[in-house]
UniProtKB/Swiss-Prot annotation:
Mn(2+) 1 binds at D255, H335, E380, E419. This is Xaa-Pro dipeptidase. Mn(2+) 2 binds at D244, D255, E419. Its cofactor is Mn(2+). One of its GO terms (biological process) is proteolysis. Keywords: Dipeptidase, Hydrolase, Manganese, Metal-binding, Metalloprotease, Protease. It comes from the Bacteria. Belongs to the peptidase M24B family. Bacterial-type prolidase subfamily. The gene is pepQ. Pfam families: PepQ_N, Peptidase_M24. GO terms for molecular function: aminopeptidase activity; metal ion binding; metalloexopeptidase activity; phosphoric triester hydrolase activity; proline dipeptidase activity. The keyword Hydrolase applies. Splits dipeptides with a prolyl residue in the C-terminal position. Its EC number is 3.4.13.9.
Amino acid sequence: MEQLARLYHDHIQVLNQRVSEIISRENLSGLVIHSGQPHRQFLDDMDYPFKVNPHFKAWLPVIENPNSWLVINGSDKPLLIFYRPVDFWHKVADEPSDFWAEHVDIKFLTKADKVAEYLPAGIDNWAYIGEHLDVADVLGFSRRNPDSVLSYLNYHRATKTDYELACMRKANEIAVTGHQAAKTAFYNGASEFEILQVYLSAISQGENQVPYSSIVALNENSAILHYTALEYTSPAQRRSFLIDAGANYNGYASDITRSYSFEKNIFDDLITAMDNMQLQIISMMKPGVSYAELHIQTHYKLAQILLDFDIVSGDVQGLVEQGITRVFFPHGLGHMLGIQVHDMGGFLSDEKGTHVAAPEAHPFLRCTRELDINQVLTIEPGVYIIDSLLAELKQDQRQSQINWNTVDVLRPFGGIRIEDNVIVHGDRIENMTRNLGLNR
């Protein structure tokens, strides 16, 4: 923890430098960042699970305390307005005493609607950063989520500080423990629901604490890209298992996927081939490489795998150009990762917010930036038997290039996705996930 505290000190300095730069450019006095506030369910007296403003948790590992605020001018010690109501119905957050507390001035807010008393004078020259524009209006903010400020912050958020990298390594360590437990549960006959409970228990995090809804899919369900339905009974025949699940540490996310076959068969061989391909793509990563180009190269490598397994016929170039590989791999190669699972800034080419769209043929790619030092990205190629996409091939001449017998053999297994979390360094690539022992 002492090392993390030292890294946090440097982290805050970097964030202050960023704020100092952008408020100087925009002639602002500073930023007021709102953690957020609860959302009430319609016609009910309960709230949805609270999700903190990512710009707030970039500064502090305070992720479950709504109605809190940060006042930052880039030079003075940040002011944390920490919400601690008098409340006998709910758990009230403890007074901050962790390693980060000494780096901020703290004032306690007991009533959410009294925050104006703690905000700086001349509030119209401060920028509000947050979701609740109605609150910003009432408080007198005229600058609310300025595009220039958000673009600057989102662009630079891609470059992680050493503190952030340490947190993400820990988030991977936690998730790997869960993945190993989930794998054992699969081979021991657990249902999707039971596997998820094993995973959450192993990482000691609840469903509302993990960074995204976990995907735990058996058999054909593995072909549903964002499958979160969960079956409560085990299938009569156990064929395959795909788990896409992460963990949270100090507000930072891990995002890991693994695929398994219950028996040694063609599907197991296909997993091995995809695993090797994923590692090949990771080996191509270095500063200056286009992430979009990595995605395109993945399609060429996948085309060869489809040929090797007699899933399709033709040649690599033609399979890619005709869009056949996109039917089997319809999503993007991955995305930036950090305080959000799909971290902001993936489409920005500069700090002014210049947007670089995904290639027209690959609209679901979530990152088009050039790789640079201290960026963290996921690499997650996949191959799936998705009937709705295959049906499109049956409508034109491309159907003759599909070996439908092999497709029928693979259909009950669903699909494969293999995802690691990777740090780009100047002289190497750090695969946090594999370094922790979560291999094939």
